[in-house]
Curated annotation (Swiss-Prot):
This is Cytochrome b. It is found in: Mitochondrion inner membrane. Belongs to the cytochrome b family. Binds 2 heme b groups non-covalently. It is a multi-pass membrane protein. It comes from Gloydius blomhoffii. A ubiquinone binds at residue 199. The gene is MT-CYB. Component of the ubiquinol-cytochrome c reductase complex (complex III or cytochrome b-c1 complex) that is part of the mitochondrial respiratory chain. The b-c1 complex mediates electron transfer from ubiquinol to cytochrome c. Contributes to the generation of a proton gradient across the mitochondrial membrane that is then used for ATP synthesis. Keywords: Electron transport, Heme, Iron, Membrane, Metal-binding, Mitochondrion, Mitochondrion inner membrane, Respiratory chain, Transmembrane, Transmembrane helix, Transport, Ubiquinone.
Length: 214
């Protein structure tokens, strides 16, 4: 009698043991790859949602309801995109906490590129939050963009340019949709730089121990 299940289990363990990763890597090192997975999911679901979205203040909310109710599997895309955004932030905060705990901020290039990624992600999330153009979307767009007026000399001009007028209106929503669509591709570029810098410095080994010791 041959226990094929046990053999396949042992084979799988052997495959994982062949990976050049020492036991000094813990579960907290998973979140970087989880963030990349989140990014792929968000781009894929967002791409399909963009097919059915209308960047118009009178039609935006209706187009989202239409996606949820009438488009085949639209509700899955919409919910995955919304929940995926929350998961994205959970993962990135754990990822940052791990970096703070292990002193990864000492690796300045990787840390600065990561901080840039966080700012880009927060900007993308903000623009996406405004897109349904519900009551909270309107409030968020007004309050957050008004912060730009605090910039001396050209703050008011910058705010007017971002709004596309003297108040939040249709041009604002169009611009926010364009920015929400293009920023994830900027995040991909910044992530590539982050990963290149990461492997250049060997940030996966904060203790400085031999990765092949076991």
């Amino acid at each position: 009698y041959i226990n094929y299940k046990n053999m396949s289990h042992q084979h799988m363990l052997m495959m994982f043991n062949l990976l050049p990763v020492g036991s000094n890597i813990s579960i907290w090192w998973n979140f970087g790859s989880m963030l990349l997975t989140c990014l792929v999911i968000q781009i894929m679901t967002g791409f399909f949602l963009a097919f059915h979205y209308t960047a118009n203040i009178n039609l935006a909310f209706s187009s989202i309801i239409h996606t949820s109710r009438d488009v085949p599997y639209g509700w899955i895309m919409q919910n995955t995109h919304a929940i995926g955004a929350s998961l994205f932030f959970i993962c990135i905060y754990i990822h940052i906490a791990r970096g703070i705990y292990y002193g990864s901020y000492l690796n300045k290039e990787v840390w600065v590129s990561g901080t840039t990624l966080l700012i880009l992600l927060m900007a993308t999330a903000f623009f996406g939050y405004v897109l349904p153009w519900g009551q909270m979307s309107f409030w968020a767009a007004t309050v957050i963009t008004n912060l730009l007026t605090a910039i001396p000399y050209f703050g008011t001009t910058l705010t007017t340019w971002l709004w596309g007028g003297f108040a939040i209106n249709d041009p604002t929503l169009t611009r926010f949709f364009a920015l929400h669509f293009i920023l994830p591709f900027t995040i991909i570029s910044a992530s590539s730089i982050h990963i290149l810098l990461l492997h250049n410095e060997g940030s996966n080994n904060p203790l400085g121990s031999n990765s092949d010791i076991d």
